[in-house]
Design a protein with these regions (language model features):
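Asp-box/BNR beta-propeller blade signature and adjacent active/binding-site loops
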Residues: 1-110
Length: 110
């Protein structure tokens, strides 16, 4: 059941021209302390690359401004597609990785 709606202006919460500045597949939620959070796969070169890390951005002002990205999970595999569920004062973060075999399949694309 949707209890609360948050309105924001359309726009970017992060913009980087850096080589590893690609952030994608976001999920947004409200933390028990009231802050907004967006989790995603970030610090990537592009959609398909082996360097993704699960990252989070935080906002204390209803989405007007956002923190720099914080790394929540990083492994030697590509950390992808973070999901978020906040319920009953608890936070569940989901993510997955791809195997080295799958990464080898796409070698040379990055």
């Amino acid at each position: 059941m949707l209890r609360e709606m948050c309105r924001m202006e359309f726009g970017k919460i992060w913009d980087s021209q850096e080589l590893f500045g690609y952030f994608a597949w976001p999920t947004a939620g409200r933390l028990p302390d009231g802050r907004l959070i967006v989790v995603c796969s970030g610090f990537r070169m592009r959609h398909v690359c082996p360097f993704g890390k699960v990252t989070a951005f935080y906002s204390d002002d209803e989405g007007k401004t956002w923190s720099s990205p914080a790394v929540l999970s990083s492994s030697i595999l590509d950390n992808r597609d973070a999901g978020l569920c906040v319920s009953g004062g608890k936070v569940l973060l989901t993510t997955f990785t791809v195997s080295r075999a799958v990464q080898r399949k796409y070698m040379g694309m990055w």
